[in-house]
Amino acid sequence: MVRECFTFLNIFVLHSIGSHVWFEDPEVAWIDGEVEKINGQEVVIQATTGKKVTAKLSKIYPKDVEAPAGGVDDMTKLSYLHEPGVLQNLKIRYELNEIYTYTGNILIAINPFQRLPHIYDAHMMQQYKGAPLGELSPHVFAVADVAYRAMINEGKSNSILVSGESGAGKTETTKMLMRYLAYLGGRAVTEGRTVEQQVLESNPVLEAFGNAKTVRNNNSSRFGKFVEIQFDKQGRISGAAIRTYLLERSRVCQISDPERNYHCFYLLCAAPQEEIEKYKLGHPKTFHYLNQSKCFELVGISDAHDYLATRRAMDIVGISEKEQEAIFRVVAAILHIGNIDFTKGKEVDSSVPKDEKSKFHLKTAAELLMCDLKALEDALCKRVMITPEEVIKRSLDPQSAVTSRDGLAKTVYSRLFDWLVDKINKSIGQDANSRSLIGVLDIYGFESFKTNSFEQFCINFTNEKLQQHFNQHVFKMEQEEYTKEAIDWSYIEFVDNQDVLDLIEKKPGGIVALLDEACMFPKSTHETFANKLYQTFKTHKRFIKPKLSRTDFAVAHYAGEVLYQSELFLDKNKDYVIPEHQDLLGASKCPFVVGLFPPLPEETSKSSKFSSIGSRFKLQLQQLMETLNCTEPHYIRCVKPNNLLKPAIFENVNIMQQLRCGGVLEAIRISCAGYPTRKPFFEFINRFGLLSPAALEGNFDEKVACQKILDNMGLKGYQIGKTKVFLRAGQMAELDARRAEVLSSAAKKIQRRIRTHQAQKRFIVLRKATISLQAICRGRLSCKHYDNLRREAAAVKIQKNGRRHYSRKSYKKLHVASLVVQTGLRAMAARKQFRFRKQTKAATIVQAQWRCHRAISYYKKLKNGVVLSQTRWRGRLAKRELRKLKMAARETGALKEAKDMLEKKVEELTYRVQLEKRSRGDLEEAKTQEILKLKSSFEEMRKKVDETNALLLKEREAAKKAAEEAPPVIKETQILVEDTKKIELMTEELESVKVTLENEKQRADDAVRKFEEAQESLEDKKKKLEETEKKGQQLQESLTRMEEKCSNLESENKVLRQQAVSMAPNKFLSGRSRSILQRGSESGHLAVDARSNLDLHSHSINHRDPSEVEDKPQKSLNEKQQENQDLLIRSIVQHLGFQGNRPITACIIYKCLLQWRSFEVERTSVFDRIIQTIGHAIETQDNNNTLAYWLSNTSTLLLLLQRTLKASGAAGMAPQRRRSSSATLFGRMSQSFRGAPPGVNLAMINGAAGGGADTFRQVEAKYPALLFKQQLTAYVEKIYGMIRDNLKKEISPLLGLCIQAPRTSRASLVKGASRSVGNTAAQQALIAHWQGIVKSLTNFLNTLKSNNVPSFLVRKVFTQIFSFINVQLFNSLLLRRECCSFSNGEYVKAGLSELEHWCFKATNEYAGSSWDELKHIRQAIGFLVVHQKPKKTLDEISHDLCPVLSIQQLYRISTMYWDDKYGTHSVSPDVIANMRVLMTEDSNNAVSNSFLLDDDSSIPFSVDDLSKSMEKFEIADIEPPPLIRENSGFSFLLPVSE
């Protein structure tokens, strides 16, 4: 067991009766009490527990009664740096859930045994980022940040050493360190998993295979781990490596109750059912390696859930699915190997599997390891001995077989763990170019149990090495402190443990060397090893031989004496694998198993050099120390507050032992050897200035004043540095004793004066009370006599009035009864007469009404039938028309395409009709000419035939005459022959003429037939042309109707309208009237003649010559419009200023867009150009004047659009209600498509001087306009956020100065009369910081007002800024204990009054509810400065004083409060206890546990909010800028008078 060997320096301390002291107690370590009597070297103490104790004067220590109620966050600030002071400070802070405490730059972390997520969230990491050590409350993040900043700034590697016993929280602390370093040096994911992600996720994997439940801890690391996190030049994590030390292999086979084996075995047994069946597993109690303990499950831990989490972590660190399957197959094989039991075989000293169950597990293990079943059995039951002559197989007895089985299991598990570490390192990767790293060492703390074996020896050897490194570091820090303060001092004695290290590691005579020597001899036993130790170290002061044991030995470590049992030292030190096991697993069919047992190199197998666990561990430790010596160390000492592993339990004795083991008390001893008490000058003067009033009244420097105080007290050996007073041990107690005497004397004088004053006051009160009592008695008697007289007079008066009342009452009763009877009789007669007349008149009226009713009923029935028929018919027509209108509204694009097609078809048909007309005329003309030709040719042919017949007749007659006058016969015959020939020729010619005539007749008949066919075809074409014209007319009418239904006309009509607008105002008005008539016609209010005029007008436009409409006018107008847009863009780039608090730029843009009808077109580039212009203008984000100017213009333009534009099809719809919850405007883009508030005054838009005041118009916006509105909304948000963030950046440094000002600008307490001047200067210096904030706020307000930013936006900006101030000040207050003081509360309260005054001056129009946003800091400061806190109840604090603060925030500020002005205390312990109860009830709610505030950077308004907040204004009289004023294209911008 550990024996205390640490004592503090025995320094004589002056004690007096009434002094508060600490004395030792065997049960609770230290108890405080008050000295009652001093007898030489003994004192009688009245303990706070009620008992009286006698103790030696040298064994008691002074108690600081003025120590803060909440302790100090750095124990070097303790007035008395000794064991009880350290223990009490840790206990106080632990009770307040302050688990971290500094001792210089050493962080002590006490395990709370409960989750505290609020102190590890991202917001807390942000707070500690870049904060100097000690500025904020102690935290593990602060140590990590200091290491990281030192590495970045100095370029030197750093290390963080986390130590502590099992269960102290080392593993969790290491996780938080790595998480914070990943937060500082992390980068965005680029290719798969990041280095920091893999490093963090390696923890669950290594915990699963290297952690186990022990007696002291449910998740104890059974190996040492050193994580090297490498960083590149930019400070980003670039690589990492994990090094492990001394895995506890024996735990695989041997565990004790109530411990557990490694977590992975239980995780695998809780795996999904298919995996359990696959590996043939069951409940953990069925396996020998697990059922040696009755603990199978951990409270609050799900092994099934952790198994899946481990598999996910394996995926992240790069272990493939196949490798994971092989890993858990090997783990399952180890469990089955442990269930193989052996019994004696047939041969002597042989063994075989015991039963079928053992054979089953043997077979399963062989299957899982994929090795030969027989070979596995032989490897467990036999040994092979190789001699020069032969190979001998030797059987093992059952006990040796069990040892062989366990050896195989330990070897396989050890190789598996080493493979995991190598795999993780390969997966993470190391950066060869990295020059700096931060190493995080998570290693076992000092251990001492009832049974301490080889593992405890190695662990304590490691801690001895680290303690030497720690002592050197602390000694170095002390030297640096003294050198920094420039004091004269002799070098303190360095506490060294080199003798213990020589005892363990010295060659050749150290314990490790002797153990290796014993392991090399086969016949060595633990008895021979122990005897060797006894002989070698019998004179060593650190080595102890027990009296009652022959094999045990003890070593006096720095933390105490530890007794080791040497029985298993030799077996555990041997580092070799049985050849049969190596051969068996090297021949496995599983590549993974073969990889765990690679073949040994030939030289290694032939080498006879012995290798041991101890030597290898010593070499690893040497390498670790070399690495640590090359780094700048930072220390975290983890402490376990109790062995029950429960929260809110603080075991003093246990913690004192851990502080010794962790070297914390050793560091305090080093400090006590020099100057343990160090007080800054102002604190020293605050506390001890009353011992020498002359030093305060003189005009002295603080340093000189401290010197005079110490000289007056007659102290020797102290030192005064540059900023602090250094006191030797015991001097602080002497000063406190002198101070107590002065205070006691002053208290007696005060008590005497107060008693005199109270007695005098009591006498005066008593005399005054006596006189008052006498006066009251006399007055009472007089009043009683007066009452009697008054009662008698009253009785007489009552009797008189009573008699009169009764008489008058009886008379009135009789008079009323008479009147009632008379009235009744007269009324009865009148009613009877009235009833008769009424009945007569009613009969007449009934008859008349009945006749009228019958006539009206018949008429109404007939009328209702007619109206019903008409209504249904009109309803059917209206529904039909409504469906068409809806279809047209939804299919505007389709209508436009149909319209274009119809226009093309009309043009085509028109062209075809004209072509047909021309072709018909040509055909008629050709037919006429052809008929004429045929007639003329026919007449000619007829004439030729007549001439030929006449000639033939003449020739016949001539022939007859010739025959008659012929000569002789021959002559006549020749003549006859010649005539005959001529006749034949003539006949032939006649026949040919007849044929020709017949042909001509046929051609004439064909021409006539064709002419008749052409006439018929022409008639058909005429009919078709008429039908076509009729269809064209119908199409034109349909086209006209579609034009009336569509909200946008085609581009040709738009150009014609613009031309008409620019040329003649009357035409523009007519076009405007036309659009109004169109909307009126849709509502059913258009007259018939107006509709006909509109149709004619539309018809005339659509039937113009295309060359006239589309070519020249459109081209010229587009060019002119482009020029106008360019001119507009050039003008708005300039700072146009404001006119009548209205931004000119926004108004000009709006009027131009409205005039050009840009909101109603499907395509336009003007919106993009305007947006680009705004974007270029705000590129300089630090120019607040420019940002404010454009915020004013964009918000005004957005307001105009919001009130003017509406989505297509939204006419007549009710305005959409505003969003119920919206974080940002841009996040609610759909809101831009909702209907705007009804109506925009045309007088405001068009510049009309009069009339039209009751006319409202909204524009149905197309997609580009709606998109422009969305972009404008985004720019309003962006510019607003830029202005707000610029103001935040400007005031952030000032806020830091404000909260730190009380520490840096406190006035000196010395220098006599100049103290008031110093106080005034300090107050002015503090207020200067707040005035700097006020000045920034005022400048921003003036900038926003000069640019006419809407007051609504100004209020939102300052509301968020004040919320930011509230968050920053409040968080700083809760994270800095020195800020939670009474004086600091007064300072901050004075600064807040400056902000309140600013809000008052800014008026509610611009400041709004800004002052209310400071409610958290105001109430917190109110708590700091309120008096008599101990008398306040929790209800008063939480409901009256600080109703806004949560219970966590109240608890934090109550525990951190300290009164540096009056020395009063915080709230009562009962209130603190009640707060802790309430916090425990809410412990499951992570959000409620957070005491810090979050800064809200969202956009706190919507478009509707902005629209409703801004009043309507006229833009008709806005003067255009000179650049566009003279341009005729912008004449519409000029007022009407011009």
UniProtKB/Swiss-Prot annotation:
Annotated region Actin-binding: the residues are 503-537, 539-562, 597-621, 621-643
Q: Which residue intervals are annotated with compositional bias (Basic and acidic residues) in the record?
A: 1017-1032
Q: Which GO terms describe its cellular component?
A: myosin complex
Q: Does the keyword ATP-binding apply?
A: yes
Binding locations of ATP: 164-171, 217-225
SMART domains reported in the protein's UniProt record: DIL, IQ, MYSc
Query: Which domain of life does the protein's organism represent?
Result: Eukaryota
InterPro entries, per the entry: Dilute_dom, IQ_motif_EF-hand-BS, Kinesin_motor_dom_sf, Myosin_head_motor_dom-like, Myosin_N, MyosinXI_CBD, MYSc_Myo11, P-loop_NTPase
Q: Which GO terms describe its biological process?
A: actin filament organization; actin filament-based movement; organelle localization; pollen tube growth
Q: Name one Pfam family in it.
A: IQ
Q: Which stretches make up the Myosin motor domain?
A: 70-740
The record places domain Myosin N-terminal SH3-like at 16-65
- Dilute domain segment(s): 1168-1481
Coiled-coil positions are 892-1064
Domain comment from the record reads as follows: IQ domain mediates interaction with calmodulin.
Query: What quaternary arrangement does the UniProt entry report?
Result: Homodimer.
- Please give the function described in this protein's UniProt entry: Myosin heavy chain that is required for the cell cycle-regulated transport of various organelles and proteins for their segregation. Functions by binding with its tail domain to receptor proteins on organelles and exerting force with its N-terminal motor domain against actin filaments, thereby transporting its cargo along polarized actin cables. Involved in trafficking of Golgi stacks and mitochondria.
Q: Which family does it belong to?
A: Belongs to the TRAFAC class myosin-kinesin ATPase superfamily. Myosin family. Plant myosin class XI subfamily.
Q: What is this protein called?
A: Myosin-9
**Species name:** Arabidopsis thaliana
Gene of this entry: XI-C
